[in-house]
């Protein structure tokens, strides 16, 4: 059963009326309602606040990494473990083909249903997850296979065990190693890009965001609690933090924005997957055509945080 957010309620009501008209066999009413639905979708999605975009990024029906992998990857073979401690369920990795192109996909997976969410730790990787990602990225480099990374995490797991096993070191090591991989790499934020948990698989030749995704150094709830000592000020925090694709593109922190279907990825997973595939293949062609893509990757990383100040 589909989940609707508060600002999507009118859309739900119209869709319910369309279904009712189909049952009654009233094709004329159906046509009128479909036109009304199109107008309402355009009205709602063209006037979203930053907080509403955050809600969409966290939408329970939004496609997760495993959903995209099932839709885009052929002959998929899962790769497990970090060869040091364990196999972290929050990080998934598959070898397969995207439209005939051999590729390795690494993703952060939140899971669906109570049992699966617990197994995936709600998409919050432990250090062994990041070490697993690095091991598989080095494997991709060894066999000259391009890498697609799907970011979707509220953040790296902050538990005592994770800290004892070197959470910060694992993230830092990934930043260092991923910046030097001698293969084309593409990272896409598909939902939430939470702080270091996202950065650990976010260093790439291309960093893009799906239209209704977010990327931030801390959750808006955490920001509101720290700045105003009031977690209820989440809407103000979301706006102030500038976590949407448009704001991050304006700041040159991401390369591209991948458009989603008009009704959002949570209503059209196949359409969103098609947009993701098109972007990945286009980016791959561009990167392969660049003479010094490693240097370009380095230069872009070094440009982060730089600014000019006028007198």
Curated annotation (Swiss-Prot):
* Superkingdom as given in the UniProt entry: Bacteria
- Where is the signal peptide, in residue numbers? none
Q: Which UniProt keywords apply?
A: ATP-binding, Cytoplasm, Fatty acid biosynthesis, Fatty acid metabolism, Lipid biosynthesis, Lipid metabolism, Nucleotide-binding, Transferase
Pathway(s): Lipid metabolism; malonyl-CoA biosynthesis; malonyl-CoA from acetyl-CoA: step 1/1
Query: Which Pfam families did the record assign?
Result: ACCA
Gene3D superfamilies per the UniProt record, alphabetical: 2-enoyl-CoA Hydratase, Chain A, domain 1 (3.90.226.10)
**GO CC: one term?**
acetyl-CoA carboxylase complex
Q: Could you tell me what this protein does?
A: Component of the acetyl coenzyme A carboxylase (ACC) complex. First, biotin carboxylase catalyzes the carboxylation of biotin on its carrier protein (BCCP) and then the CO(2) group is transferred by the carboxyltransferase to acetyl-CoA to form malonyl-CoA.
Q: Which family does it belong to?
A: Belongs to the AccA family.
- Protein name from the UniProt record: Acetyl-coenzyme A carboxylase carboxyl transferase subunit alpha
Organism of provenance: Wolinella succinogenes (strain ATCC 29543 / DSM 1740 / CCUG 13145 / JCM 31913 / LMG 7466 / NCTC 11488 / FDC 602W)
Gene name linked to the record: accA
